[in-house]
Structure formats: structure tokens, C-alpha cells
Amino acid sequence: YEAGGSSAKSNLSPKGNKAKLQGDWLQYVTCINDYIEDYNPIIGRQEELLRTIQILSRKEKNNPLHVGEPGVGKTALVYGLASLIERHEVPECLEGCKIFSLDLGSLIAGTQYRGDFEKRLKAVLDGALAASPAILYIDEIHNIIGAGKIDKGSLDAGNILKPYLEGGKLRFMGATT
């Protein structure tokens, strides 16, 4: 499994992954499960973590969104969840899930033509769907709802995400301030 990822994570070393994933979409995501050994355990957020697991375990409306001030630990909850998944301490419906963190910087960078952003995002969504069971984590999700929108008739990320949200094809987690 060769993952792209943000430069902030370049000094971290991914652990060996059982399944080799392939595709151009990997340059826009980082598999959090591969990096959990490099992070400290989550402490004092069990209630929020349990609630996140409950939401992800639902059959419908199963996409949690963490809202809070900067630095309160919204992303830490995602790493805590990945740690629980790797230790097999989650419900059966979440067993074996890979959590992919979307790198918005690389996804948006260089999208100078109308439709480039949508094409890249759709490739990421299709890739994550093919890697199922998977959860796509979008930090600062407010930045992409409306991104790429030029006029009333054009697509934006919200319209691209909707088909994947319907029917639980792919699970999402979001965070915003």
C-alpha cells in the first residue's frame, strides 16, 4: 500500500498493510489506520468516541460531524476510532474499516479548469468505495461544500457526496469549527 498524503505526515512511517490498494486517488488521502502507532492514545474523550461509534453503527444517518473550536481534539477522535478498529474493540459493522483522511490541499491544488475538482473528488470517493469497508474523514469540511461552484447550475462537492451518502454506500466523518 503506497499512500500519498500530506507533507505533515511524511516523517511518519506507515505500518504494513495487509491489502495493497492502488489507484491515483491514493495521492489525495492518508490511511489513518496505518499511522496510529505514531500517535498518543486518546484520553478523556470516551463519551465522544462512544457516540461516534454509535452513529457510525446506524443503518441510516450514520455520518458523524464533529464541531468545535480549534484544538479541542476533533481529529484526535478519528485517531482514537482507528486505534479501536485496529484493536478489534468496535462493533462488527466497523470491523476491518480503513479510515482515509482527505487531503484537501492536494485535492484542490492545480484544479484550474471547471470540473477538475469534481473529477478528483469523484475518483477519491470511488476509490474509497472500492476499498470498503472504509470511512472517509474530511477535516474542515466546510471548505469543500460550495467549492468548485461557479454559478447556480454547476456542481459542488455537496452534490457529488449525496449519492455516496444515500444508502450507506460509504461512511463519512467530518470536522469543522
Feature-to-residue mapping (PLM):
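Histone-fold recognition with a strong bias for associated Lys/Arg-rich disordered tails
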Residues: 1-108, 117-131, 135-143, 167, ...
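Substrate-gripping "pore-loop 1 plus following alpha2 helix"
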Residues: 116-121, 146-167
